[in-house]
């Protein structure tokens, strides 16, 4: 299989785009079940991806243009049947992983509710939520998406959105934020293995999420005048 001769700059821009806009169908369905229209959520993410990549491209220095070939092995071509078998095995393990994570999250959430821990956790992160432009009430949903991602945190997000006393605008702001900036641990770590700068994997989409929510809030205020 031929390896594309991408530079570190190009890989960084691709990573930034993918970190914001990936798994759009599945995550769009999850977001639709918990407070925002899927097309609206997807459109926000795609626009945010394009704008963020354009801005990041302005800041990348020319000395990042070395082609990334060292340390990256080429994948050997596989027969179709073998490839299909490997895909089924990988998908099976992924399903088990998702099931275990979701079950663990639901059990943890139940324990936290029983001992009234959620209120204390949300209160601790309230300054972060305020900076993100989010209401403190959506704190547990934001934590689930930011740490575990929309897909893995789906059960918590959907369940809490249905049970919680959230208004439409609060949920829309939440989904704009987590749509752009979620799975802050696992997803960027995948690109770190390619030798990309950690700053560009975390900071741009975090700032984009903050800016997007505040602009959305401002637009609603102007609209209500």
Region roles according to the model:
Residues 46-129, 207, 211, 224-225:
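Selected transmembrane alpha-helices and immediately adjacent juxtamembrane segments
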Residues 1, 38-48, 86-89, 115-126, ...:
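Hydrophobic alpha-helical transmembrane segments
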Residues 17, 43, 91-95, 108-112, ...:
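Hydrophobic alpha-helical transmembrane segments of multi-pass membrane proteins
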């Amino acid at each position: 299989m031929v390896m594309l001769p991408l530079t570190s700059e190009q890989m960084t821009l691709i990573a930034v785009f993918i970190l914001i806009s990936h798994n759009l169908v599945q995550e769009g369905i999850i977001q639709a079940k918990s407070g925002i229209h899927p097309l609206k959520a997807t459109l926000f993410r795609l626009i945010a991806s394009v704008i963020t990549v354009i801005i990041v491209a302005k800041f990348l220095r020319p000395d990042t243009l070395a082609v990334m070939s060292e340390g990256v092995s080429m994948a050997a071509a596989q027969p179709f049947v073998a490839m299909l078998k490997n895909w089924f095995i990988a998908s099976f393990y992924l399903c088990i992983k998702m099931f275990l994570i979701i079950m663990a999250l639901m059990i943890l959430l139940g324990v936290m509710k029983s001992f009234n821990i959620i209120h204390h956790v949300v209160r601790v992160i309230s300054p972060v939520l305020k900076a993100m432009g989010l209401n403190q009430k959506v704190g547990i949903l934001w934590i689930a998406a930011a740490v575990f991602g929309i897909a893995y945190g789906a059960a918590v997000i959907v369940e809490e959105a249905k049970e919680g006393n959230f208004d439409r605008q609060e949920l829309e702001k939440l989904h704009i934020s987590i749509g752009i900036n979620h799975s802050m641990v696992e997803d960027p770590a995948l690109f770190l293995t390619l030798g990309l700068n950690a700053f560009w994997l975390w900071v741009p989409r975090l700032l984009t999420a903050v800016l997007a929510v505040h602009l959305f809030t401002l637009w609603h205020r102007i609209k209500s005048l």
